[in-house]
Amino acid sequence: MNSAIMQGAAMATSHGIARLNRHNAQRNHFHIPTANRLFYQLQTPCTSTEEERRTVQTDDVAEIGMQRPDYQMYCGEEEISEQFVKLNVGGQRFMLRKDTIRRRGVGRLLDLINKPVADSNADAFFSSTSEFYFERPPSLFHIVYQFYLNGVIHQPSNLCPVDIIEELEYWRIIPDQYLASCCCAQQIDDDDEEVEEQDKPNLFKTLRFGEIRRCVWNIIEEPASSGKAQAFAVCSVVFVLISISGLVLGSLPELQVATKQRNNLTGEEFTEMEPMPILGYIEYVCIVWFTMEYGLKMLVSAERSKTFRQLLNIIDLLAILPFIIEMLLLIFGISTEQLRDLKGAFLVIRILRVLRVIRVLKLGRYSSGLQMFGKTLKASFRQLGMMAMVVMTGVIFFSTLVYFLEKDEPASKFHSIPAACWWCIVTMTTVGYGDLTPVTVPGKLVATGAIACGVLVLALPITIIVDNFMKVAETERPAGGNRYRTSQYPKATKSEQMILKVT
């Protein structure tokens, strides 16, 4: 008897718990499966006040706070057909509320819901499932679907920009007013550069001898524009390599000749050595080519002030600056031999001669790899500045510690904090020349801390720099293809040109 009573109570309790769970599921949509959650949200009855309407939870398809008509607990097929449009795009099913499509007010889908099924612009209509079939790629339709939900057009990085343009044209959506700012803000600078490149022919048209100047400019600045431009670029690279080779070979004792006897600061005589005359002649030939190249570029340029300020042109000027100064001194009757007795002037002359090594940077004009490296450093300028600041702080901190710990030791070489700074830089960069080493136990502990901090400080920005390099490489990779594709869309709008450049 007691067991029967207990069993009945347990059954009653289980039935009560089940009823309570069903009741909670009706009140709280979080217990409803995800697939049915949309229908449950649309089944939420119309609330009476604005305060209650704001608290109605809806998802992306339905706007928050928007008043809904009363729905039954479960929508039937007839109600779904009246409120929704079913799409089958390339075998993948989509569903949108008709109110959402009307709210955007544009596109092929707007015509689809406003016309009868017989007059629809779909490729087919499946009467069994009430689906409109479109023989289009579903991966591209996701962009259109997101546009109807959010009102903006985003571009995934894994899709071809030309395909996106064609897909938007098919769905009769013009991206002028709907392109998301996040998808074009990064490319503003690149777009400005492209506009400038497209406007250069127009700039030359307004100048005297504009056509001739434009042809010469393309030969000098656009190596890929013609065969003459490629030949000119090859000659420039050859002259750069010859000039650098002459500078390097001129330092070999076997290729040097004695000029005259001179006295050093202590009064001792020494024989001054100079490179062989043949190397000097080669240097003059290279200088003539570089000067001709730079002068011709400035002569035919449509915007000389802007051309003068460009980095690569500044490098070209520095490469010929020693020769220009030497020629100016000769014009005024001053030779470099007369300046050798003046300590400061002779130092300036030597510094100007050292500037010849800058010519190796001229190769960056014809090397896409060097250009990518320069853009990577420019993109990583903030991270490099942060690393330099942290390294400088660590150098000052550890060098001061090791100086005061080591300066009183008889065998110590840490005679000053600047000397300790040199040791700290070598240590933190894990180079370790070994010319300065701590001898005390506290000094060695400080050295251990400097090594550990150096590894951490130098390792952290590396990942950021590599990431920036990958981004630069990714943007540079399709640059030529985008330029070609844009030329096939001469009437493309500004937004379409941005889409063509985003990947």
Swiss-Prot record:
<feature type="topological domain" description="Cytoplasmic">
    <location>
        <begin position="367"/>
        <end position="383"/>
    </location>
</feature>
<keyword id="KW-0407">Ion channel</keyword>
<feature type="intramembrane region">
    <location>
        <begin position="430"/>
        <end position="434"/>
    </location>
</feature>
<protein>
    <recommendedName>
        <fullName>Probable voltage-gated potassium channel subunit kvs-4</fullName>
    </recommendedName>
</protein>
<keyword id="KW-0472">Membrane</keyword>
<dbReference type="InterPro" id="IPR003971">
    <property type="entry name" value="K_chnl_volt-dep_Kv5/Kv9"/>
</dbReference>
<dbReference type="GO" id="GO:0015459">
    <property type="term" value="F:potassium channel regulator activity"/>
</dbReference>
<dbReference type="GO" id="GO:0030424">
    <property type="term" value="C:axon"/>
</dbReference>
<feature type="transmembrane region" description="Helical; Name=Segment S5">
    <location>
        <begin position="384"/>
        <end position="404"/>
    </location>
</feature>
<dbReference type="InterPro" id="IPR011333">
    <property type="entry name" value="SKP1/BTB/POZ_sf"/>
</dbReference>
<keyword id="KW-1003">Cell membrane</keyword>
<feature type="transmembrane region" description="Helical; Name=Segment S2">
    <location>
        <begin position="276"/>
        <end position="296"/>
    </location>
</feature>
<dbReference type="InterPro" id="IPR003968">
    <property type="entry name" value="K_chnl_volt-dep_Kv"/>
</dbReference>
<dbReference type="Pfam" id="PF02214">
    <property type="entry name" value="BTB_2"/>
</dbReference>
<feature type="transmembrane region" description="Helical; Name=Segment S3">
    <location>
        <begin position="314"/>
        <end position="334"/>
    </location>
</feature>
<feature type="short sequence motif" description="Required for dendritic localization">
    <location>
        <begin position="217"/>
        <end position="219"/>
    </location>
</feature>
<feature type="intramembrane region" description="Helical; Name=Pore helix">
    <location>
        <begin position="418"/>
        <end position="429"/>
    </location>
</feature>
<dbReference type="InterPro" id="IPR003131">
    <property type="entry name" value="T1-type_BTB"/>
</dbReference>
<feature type="transmembrane region" description="Helical; Name=Segment S6">
    <location>
        <begin position="446"/>
        <end position="466"/>
    </location>
</feature>
<feature type="topological domain" description="Extracellular">
    <location>
        <begin position="435"/>
        <end position="445"/>
    </location>
</feature>
<feature type="topological domain" description="Cytoplasmic">
    <location>
        <begin position="297"/>
        <end position="313"/>
    </location>
</feature>
<keyword id="KW-0631">Potassium channel</keyword>
<comment type="similarity">
    <text>Belongs to the potassium channel family. B (Shab) (TC 1.A.1.2) subfamily. Kv2.2/KCNB2 sub-subfamily.</text>
</comment>
<feature type="topological domain" description="Cytoplasmic">
    <location>
        <begin position="467"/>
        <end position="503"/>
    </location>
</feature>
<feature type="transmembrane region" description="Helical; Name=Segment S1">
    <location>
        <begin position="232"/>
        <end position="252"/>
    </location>
</feature>
<feature type="topological domain" description="Extracellular">
    <location>
        <begin position="253"/>
        <end position="275"/>
    </location>
</feature>
<feature type="transmembrane region" description="Helical; Voltage-sensor; Name=Segment S4">
    <location>
        <begin position="347"/>
        <end position="366"/>
    </location>
</feature>
<dbReference type="InterPro" id="IPR027359">
    <property type="entry name" value="Volt_channel_dom_sf"/>
</dbReference>
<feature type="region of interest" description="S4-S5 linker">
    <location>
        <begin position="368"/>
        <end position="383"/>
    </location>
</feature>
<feature type="topological domain" description="Extracellular">
    <location>
        <begin position="335"/>
        <end position="346"/>
    </location>
</feature>
<feature type="short sequence motif" description="Required for dendritic localization">
    <location>
        <begin position="496"/>
        <end position="500"/>
    </location>
</feature>
<dbReference type="GO" id="GO:0043204">
    <property type="term" value="C:perikaryon"/>
</dbReference>
<keyword id="KW-0406">Ion transport</keyword>
<keyword id="KW-0633">Potassium transport</keyword>
<dbReference type="InterPro" id="IPR028325">
    <property type="entry name" value="VG_K_chnl"/>
</dbReference>
<dbReference type="GO" id="GO:0005249">
    <property type="term" value="F:voltage-gated potassium channel activity"/>
</dbReference>
<dbReference type="GO" id="GO:0030425">
    <property type="term" value="C:dendrite"/>
</dbReference>
<feature type="glycosylation site" description="N-linked (GlcNAc...) asparagine">
    <location>
        <position position="264"/>
    </location>
</feature>
<keyword id="KW-0812">Transmembrane</keyword>
<keyword id="KW-0325">Glycoprotein</keyword>
<dbReference type="GO" id="GO:0071805">
    <property type="term" value="P:potassium ion transmembrane transport"/>
</dbReference>
<keyword id="KW-0966">Cell projection</keyword>
